[in-house]
Amino acid sequence: MKTELSEVWQQCIDHLERHTSKTAIENWVRSTRPVAVVEDTIIVGVQGEFAKHRMESRYAPLLRQALRDLTKRNMQLKFVANPNVIEDPAAEPVDAPNVADLPAGTSAPAAEQNARLLGYINPKYTFETFVVGNSNRFAHAAALAVAETPARTYNPLFIYGGVGLGKTHLMHAIGHYVLQHNPTAKVAYVSTETFTNEFIMAIQKGSTTAFQNRYRKVDVLLIDDIQFLAGKEATQEEFYHTFNAIREANKQIVISSDRPPKEIPTLEDRLRSRFEWGLICDIQPPDLETRTAILRKKAQSEGIQVPDEVTNYIATNIETNIRELEGALTRVVAYANMLKCPLTYDLAVQALKDILPPVRPKQITIATIKQVVAEHYNIRMQDFEVRNRSRAVAYPRQIAMYLARELTDSSLPKIGEEFGGRDHTTVIHACEKIAKDIQSDPAFAHTIEQLIARIRAE
């Protein structure tokens, strides 16, 4: 009997797992996703060009054999990196085993959602994983409102902003939300480039009616990078009628672009005016706090412990692009894994030396250390120098001595002098005590990391 393409692909992966290592499956194959069947070719989305090369060179023959065993057909495979592929209306369903033979754990809800989705949306791009800050708060609120009540609030919703700022993330999040909360809704996500290519192919094949039906009979149309519609007169004409058909059916349209409608060159005025009918909102480059939060969220989602001094260094030096921001973190983590070294500030500087300007040595002073520690522990600057033995004062003083020893070139006598003329043996005792506490108390070690990050940021 016929069954979902995704279910067949899952069976194929399970079959492959019996003939290769589990590590290989988890690292390379498990993240792939079948996005369409065109004649006897299954189009499979992978996460990037490197993954595409790996799949083609290493696993494609095994997967083709698995498909032959399962479907009794000589299926071909085509791997595409970061796919935005719309299902072909003439695509043939795959012959598969009886549904009773499907592997355990196949998700019926997931398969049902895929049946209502044209195109590909990244499973990681949800509202829950989107980090909200001052630069994107309005766009996030508008996207969520549209997802909750499609075609009732802002229609169309037009989101614009620079490359890598989160426009596509929000569009995918809308798609996920609608599919999860509306059991009958049909969603299409497509890039303007793919829409154009599909339209050209439909003209060549004489299948424009099928093409039009596919896009005009959805409940939510998410179209990315609409600026690439500029100069394409025939595609603009087609999209104009698609836009009207969806609006007249009281369905939702969400559009993204790298610029507002009025700045898209050679765009027909009738399209420009329609893009301005609903709500236009922009996404700006994230501020430092948002960039830091994005990195921490990324690290948390990957299950990686990243010191604050590392995230602060990356967030401070990469200011305009979230993709570059996350890419830098990935590079640092990979660098640490390859060298089998802990993640540190110095390692991050080394890992990113080819993509970031060289760090100018910053002179950290004992005065700066004392100021940061005093603010953190709510004591006065003069408390570092007085003969006060209470723990509320003595312990922060020992911390400041330890940090002075670690972050400056000052000698032990010089450090002692800066802390009320204390003997160098007192400084040694303080450094040894704090070092021991760092080793035995992870929470305290995290506090020290935060203090170091703040000192370096001053």
Swiss-Prot record:
User: Which intervals of the chain are annotated as region Domain II?
Assistant: 94-119
Q: Which PROSITE patterns match?
A: DNAA
DNA-binding among the record's keywords? yes
Task: List the cysteine pairs that form cystine.
Answer: none
- Binding-site residues for ATP, renumbered to this chain: 164, 166-168
Domain III, AAA+ region: annotated segments: 120-336
Q: Which UniProt keywords apply?
A: ATP-binding, Cytoplasm, DNA replication, DNA-binding, Lipid-binding, Nucleotide-binding
**What are the GO cellular component annotations?**
cytoplasm; plasma membrane
The main place the protein resides is cytoplasm
Segments carrying the region annotation (Domain I, interacts with DnaA modulators) are 1-93
Q: Which InterPro entries match?
A: AAA+_ATPase (IPR003593), Chromosome_initiator_DnaA (IPR001957), Chromosome_initiator_DnaA-like (IPR020591), Chromosome_initiator_DnaA_CS (IPR018312), DnaA_C (IPR013159), DnaA_dom (IPR013317), DnaA_N_dom (IPR024633), DnaA_N_sf (IPR038454)
* Record-level Gene Ontology MF annotations: ATP binding; ATP hydrolysis activity; DNA replication origin binding; lipid binding
Q: Does the keyword Magnesium apply?
A: no
Q: Which GO terms describe its biological process?
A: DNA replication initiation; regulation of DNA replication
Tell me any Pfam family this protein matches: DnaA_N
Where does this one sit in the cell? Cytoplasm
Q: Which domain of life is it from?
A: Bacteria
Give the residue ranges for region: Domain IV, binds dsDNA: 337-458
Its domain comment says:
Domain I is involved in oligomerization and binding regulators, domain II is flexibile and of varying length in different bacteria, domain III forms the AAA+ region, while domain IV binds dsDNA.
**Could you describe the subunit structure of this protein?**
Oligomerizes as a right-handed, spiral filament on DNA at oriC.
Which family does the record assign? Belongs to the DnaA family.
Protein purpose: Plays an essential role in the initiation and regulation of chromosomal replication. ATP-DnaA binds to the origin of replication (oriC) to initiate formation of the DNA replication initiation complex once per cell cycle. Binds the DnaA box (a 9 base pair repeat at the origin) and separates the double-stranded (ds)DNA. Forms a right-handed helical filament on oriC DNA; dsDNA binds to the exterior of the filament while single-stranded (ss)DNA is stabiized in the filament's interior.
Q: Any idea what this protein is called?
A: Chromosomal replication initiator protein DnaA
Q: Which organism is it from?
A: Symbiobacterium thermophilum (strain DSM 24528 / JCM 14929 / IAM 14863 / T)
Gene name, please? dnaA
